[in-house]
């Protein structure tokens, strides 16, 4: 009798131990799953609560969201700007500004109580933990792939994959039309894009933001020497004296809006070096705005393409 009771007691203990181990393993797995990939947490939030309250810590991700018809509850304002970028400001009237991308307003972000936070790895990659204390995060490497890839990724997260694909198709169709218009104007000529600031003259490389839309989407041929630029940098600073070396048939020009930059461009225009450029003498100089042309996002590229279409339709 004693032996049977002892065996029964040991069996009960064994069952309890196994049950405890099972619960511990399940708890460990759940913990690992929630910290290993915070994008999964973001997807779970979406499925449980419908449309998410998204906070975007990247102007480019904000604009990708806008392309899909989604307005983030909060967004950084980007760069040195003191407000949302002009070409999208009217679409962000109900969005809380979260400060510049390099120094976001964490208190304002916390007060928003977002369901999920979108981060740009370049600016927030070292601070993921502090954002995770507020909400699940999804980190994007904007140097990995193109804006199309980023738009598709966001489309998956917000259940708007069809809308993302349609946006890309519409952009491709318009691009083909603009290609034809530009070719009718400059033929197979070479192209360069420059930016005039208060202190320097820059030539854009093949890298984003300017390179992809000119040399990939529109298939234009870079002027001499541009392919030799450091492809990890968006531009190279030059002196006006070397402008003739590029021998460009057409020049796209971005001039900063401040008075100093405007004065510097006027001075450049009056310089014999500028006046002697092939593109200038042929009338193939095209002024463009910093926004949307330097906004490497789905909405930025679409608006830039719209401007190019209008500009070259008049030629």
Describe the function of each predicted region.
Residues 249-315:
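Structured C-terminal subdomain patch of bacterial secreted/periplasmic proteins
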Residues 9, 22-47:
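Short, low-complexity, disordered segments immediately C-terminal to signal peptides
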Residues 113-118, 136, 243, 247-251:
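Proline-aspartate-enriched helix->loop->beta-strand connector
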Residues 84, 142-154, 189-213, 229-230, ...:
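Extracytoplasmic ligand-binding site segments that recognize negatively charged/polar headgroups
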Residues 130, 134-199, 284, 295, ...:
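Extracytoplasmic substrate-binding proteins
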């Amino acid at each position: 009798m004693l032996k049977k009771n002892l065996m029964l007691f040991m069996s009960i203990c064994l069952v309890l131990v196994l049950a405890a181990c099972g619960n511990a393993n399940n708890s460990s797995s759940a913990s690992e799953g929630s910290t290993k990939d915070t994008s999964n947490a973001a997807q779970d939030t979406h499925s449980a609560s419908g449309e998410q309250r998204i906070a975007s810590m990247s102007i480019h991700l904000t604009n990708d969201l806008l392309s899909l018809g989604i307005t983030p509850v909060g967004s950084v304002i980007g760069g040195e700007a003191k407000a949302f970028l002009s070409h999208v400001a009217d679409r962000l009237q109900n969005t809380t500004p979260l400060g510049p991308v390099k120094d976001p307003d964490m208190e304002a972000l916390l007060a928003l109580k977002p369901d999920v936070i979108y981060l740009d790895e370049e600016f927030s990659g070292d601070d993921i933990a502090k954002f995770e204390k507020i909400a699940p995060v999804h980190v994007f490497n904007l140097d990995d792939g193109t804006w199309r890839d980023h738009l598709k990724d966001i489309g998956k997260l917000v259940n708007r994959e069809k809308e993302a694909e349609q946006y890309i198709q519409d952009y491709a169709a318009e691009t083909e039309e603009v290609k034809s218009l530009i070719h009718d104007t400059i033929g197979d000529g070479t192209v360069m894009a420059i930016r005039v600031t208060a202190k320097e003259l820059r030539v854009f490389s093949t890298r984003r933001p300017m390179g992809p839309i000119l040399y990939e989407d529109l298939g234009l041929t870079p002027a001499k020497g541009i392919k030799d630029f450091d492809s990890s940098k968006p531009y190279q600073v030059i002196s006006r004296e070397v402008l003739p070396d590029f021998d460009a048939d057409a020049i796209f020009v971005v001039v900063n809006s401040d008075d100093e930059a405007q004065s510097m461009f006027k001075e450049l225009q009056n310089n014999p070096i500028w006046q002697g450029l092939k593109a200038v003498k042929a009338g193939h100089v095209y002024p463009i705005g910093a926004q949307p042309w330097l906004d490497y996002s789905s909405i930025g590229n679409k608006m830039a393409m719209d401007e190019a279409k209008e500009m070259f339709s008049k030629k």
